[in-house]
A protein has these predicted regions:
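Conserved beta-strand-loop surface patch within small alpha/beta domains used
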Residues: 1-82, 90-136
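Conserved, mostly hydrophobic/aromatic
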Residues: 85
Length: 136
């Protein structure tokens, strides 16, 4: 009873799929808010370990500054297609801060950092673990 074998945990990584159009829109949005942070809501679908981003929403009443961006979640209309957020970091780091993790919304958080290009986008889960991104 006390000496049971521990079950092995098969860690399956979630994968994020972004279209070229979504990626270009995010890059343009981040550049337009520089040197402040910009934030968008991701719309999409989750199928098993695959998260496909199908749209972007500019959050109502969002706030932007050089070290923060956010929005009041209670002002959002109810929509089951919201799967997370993407926001920009005007610095050269696309790692989530403690503040980013504490204000996590949805299944995934994407961060794009300066100079705002495709390879500057990173995805994270609620615990700050990296997720794979596919741009197609």
């Amino acid at each position: 009873l006390f000496f049971r074998k521990k079950k092995e945990i098969n860690e399956v990584r979630r994968r994020i799929i972004l279209t070229k159009q979504i990626t270009d829109s995010v890059i343009t949005y981040a550049k337009s808010w520089h040197p402040n942070e910009g934030i968008l809501i991701l719309q999409g679908k989750k199928e098993k370990n695959l998260i496909k981003v199908t749209g972007l929403i500019i959050p109502p009443f969002s706030t932007h500054g050089p070290y923060y961006s956010g929005f009041p979640v209670y002002e959002l209309p109810f929509d089951l297609s919201y799967i997370g957020t993407i926001h920009s970091h005007p610095s050269r780091s696309n790692k989530p801060s403690l503040e980013d993790l504490n204000h996590f919304f949805g299944l995934v958080s994407l961060i794009i950092c300066y100079p705002y290009d495709t390879e500057d986008i990173a995805a994270f889960d609620r615990n700050g673990n990296n997720m794979d991104i596919e741009i197609g």
